[in-house]
Amino acid sequence: MEKDHLVEEEKKDKVESEKPEEGVTVPKVESNDDIHQTDTPKVDSTTSEGKLKDPVAVERPSINSTNTSSSGGFGNTVNDLSQPSTRPVTTAETSTNSNLPWDGNQANRNLNSQSYDLRVHLLKSLGIEDISRIDIADNKLLERFFSLHIEREQKEIEKLKTKNLEKLELIVDKFVSNEKFTNDTLNKLLELISSKSIDSHDLLGSSSIQLKRTEHSPNRLMSPRGHKRYKSEIPTVPETQYSHINYNIHGQPVNMVYHQAYQQVTPQTYYVPQGNQAWHQGSYTQGNRATFQPPSLANSNINNSEDVKLQEGVKVEPSGRARQRSSTSLGASLSTSNSTSNLSNTMKAATANEGKDTGSNDGHHTGSYGASNASNVMPSQVNNPNYMTYGSVRGGPYVMVQQPPGQQMATQYIPAGNQGFYQSVVPNQGHMNGMVASSQGYQANTPQPATSDNMVMLGNQYRGNETLHQDATPSLSSSTSQKRQGHRRTQSANVVLSTGRSPNRMNMQRQVNFLIHTPKHPPPT
């Protein structure tokens, strides 16, 4: 029963809503068929003044109805939806709707702003300015536009090619018609064109100058001492040059005969010819000694000045029986070295004629010893088969004789003049502390064959069977111990070479620099 009652009330409400109210004009709504048949829609709505509001106004159905039911409430919602209402649409609304890319296309509204702007920019670059009538969301449409644009560019390129060919033909015709144009000029033009093309290809090529690249190992970069030198980077001394080099207690190379701390003098070597050989037939290592004329034995001149320079390397090579006689006599005279009578008499005889004939000493200035002076010190040594090294160090000359392995002899110092036999052979006792060979400091041991290993060194180190007295030369152990006293981490370690080995057999050793880390001075972290 209640349902029937509700249905009757709804029917009554429908009838009342269909009746027109007084003062309200109901607009006539045309069907869709009428709208398609006529181009311009009919406008029935007027304003309260009786004039047309907008001549272009179009009535459209509105979903929300302004009419309310008499009963109030929401019972009239169905009638509101069923009855379409019209409202005028102005030109302002149509202009705002026309700003959209394609009015009525939902796909354009779903595009992102960035893609939309990009597509608009591309279309404008192709020459399309009015984009309002184009569906930008359609990808196929964009591809068509781009294909058309590419075709246009290709046509323009072909036009340029044809124009260039026409100009080239005209230029070639002019050159051919000219009499001055020959094959040589044509070849030159072709060479220029080919060279330009090659240069253009080689612009990015590698340069002819190869730069040296410094290779840094990761160990060097990670080390706290980045300036550390490796073994391969340190220059080595050849084996042939090492025989002339000696090392002191500090590990520094010094001259074997002359100490580095006082003065270094370049040694000079002379060649003494054989007994039967003329002096001009001998070979000389120094060019300025080519005119050297040795004085005779009677005209020997031994200078005792303090400015005498060092000379060494006299080589005597006699032959025959004189070799045996001289070797035996020289060995006998030198073996009795402890008694100075024989040598002193020899020196007196040699120096008796001092200053008699100075003009025969050609090629030498006053105060220097020549090869003849060394040979005149001991007359028996002129035809000696041995190697005789001589020189003088501010006190007088010395002679170092080396015997072949078959014979035995001793090596002696031979001073000049009236000086003592073993008196002050080393220069300047103040500079050479403890490096003086006194008369009590020389001891002749058992003779031994003098070879290249048994060599005389003045004051610094003595290599051979003959040894100096302990009072004359201080031991290396005491000197090194004094140097190592108060050793701190800032000082480098000293490498002392062995004194019992010859320099030829000695291995190459370098100064070793390292830090000693203690708990008080730990290594860097």
Swiss-Prot record:
Q: Does this UniProt record's set of keywords contain Transcription regulation?
A: yes
Q: Where is this region: Disordered?
A: 1-108, 285-376, 467-506
User: What GO CC annotations are associated with the protein?
Assistant: nucleus
Q: Which family does it belong to?
A: Belongs to the POG1 family.
Task: Specify whether Cell cycle is a keyword of the entry.
Answer: yes
Function recorded in the entry = Transcriptional activator which promotes cell cycle recovery, after pheromone induced G1 arrest. May also be involved in stress-resistance.
| Composition skew (Basic and acidic residues), residue ranges | 1-22, 30-42, 306-320, 354-365
Please list the GO biological process terms of this entry: cell division
Q: Which UniProt keywords apply?
A: Activator, Cell cycle, Cell division, Mitosis, Nucleus, Stress response, Transcription, Transcription regulation
Which gene is this protein's source? POG1
Polar residues composition-biased segments: 78-108, 285-305, 470-483, 491-506
Its name, as the record gives it, is Transcriptional activator POG1
